[in-house]
Amino acid sequence: MRGTVRTRGTVRTRGTVRTRDMLRAAIAGAGAAAPVLAIAILGVAVITPAGHDAGRLAFRLASAIRILPRQSAAAARGRPFSGTPAVGALFTTSGGHLADHFCTASVVHSRGGDLLLTAAHCLTGKPIGRGGIVFVPAYHDGQSPYGAWRITAVFVDSAWSSRHDPDDDVAFLRAGRPGSQIEQATGAERLGVGLPPQQVRVIGYPDAAARPITCRAPARGFGPRQLVFDCDGYADGTSGGPFLAHVSKATGRGTVIGVIGGYQQGGDTPDVSYSIRFLANVAALYETASRG
């Protein structure tokens, strides 16, 4: 998770644990009564059937291992920059002043010109209403070039609110300021639903940094309803950061096809990030938020 309660850095065995679970499932499917042969794969002791059952098990093991995220020995790394207008940081407030930024959000085009997009887990336990959370677009180095916008409403899917389903880790927020619309001030990203995995630019605000980071790399499929993105530096605070496809060189805006969140609430290590895939559930939630 990349919100304030995430323990990034303390869990470093995620890949090993996931592999072990997959190996156990593959072994169970091979038949418990078969003769066995002890082998070792990825440092995990495995008991596998001897004879021709070993061939079927080897296929299951290879399939399990292949679906794990790939990481390059020379992985890309996010670089700090001064920000872009339609992406910003979510802050808590204290005494009417900005306190700490804890997650990332982006402005998305809507009929009312007032919707933001982030990860649902970012809002868990946060004080919505009465100015408890504000959005600061293009925040950097203590500067708020487009001001601070109060969050007045939050929209999440019922599957998230009832059981925190990782495939529904997305939220739309309404941002308000008397007499103005945020989209008129900052411009907006487009919402992309049902699009395939592709090259993206991901922007996020690490909570210990004064500037956002940006990185371009492929977003790959991770199961039927998730995406995975390999780039280092996406630590606490980057949850909700948009996966931007087709970014315009002229405006810096693009099409949001995901946000950091989903599996492991965005990832247990800074070099691998996840997002849900934007499918019919996100389209329906967007329509609800647009009407609400």
Residue ranges of predicted features:
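Catalytic histidine site
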Residues: 82-139, 219-223
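Chymotrypsin/trypsin-fold serine protease catalytic domain
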Residues: 151, 166-237
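C-terminal cap/linker of serine protease catalytic domains
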Residues: 257, 263-292
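Catalytic nucleophile loop of clan PA
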Residues: 233-259
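Conserved catalytic-core segment of clan PA serine endopeptidases
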Residues: 73-85, 92-94, 133-179
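Loop/turn elements at helix/coil->beta-strand transitions in domains of secreted/extracellular proteins
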Residues: 112-114, 196-199, 252-255
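Solvent-exposed loop/turn segments at secondary-structure junctions
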Residues: 96-97, 112-113, 122-125, 141-143, ...
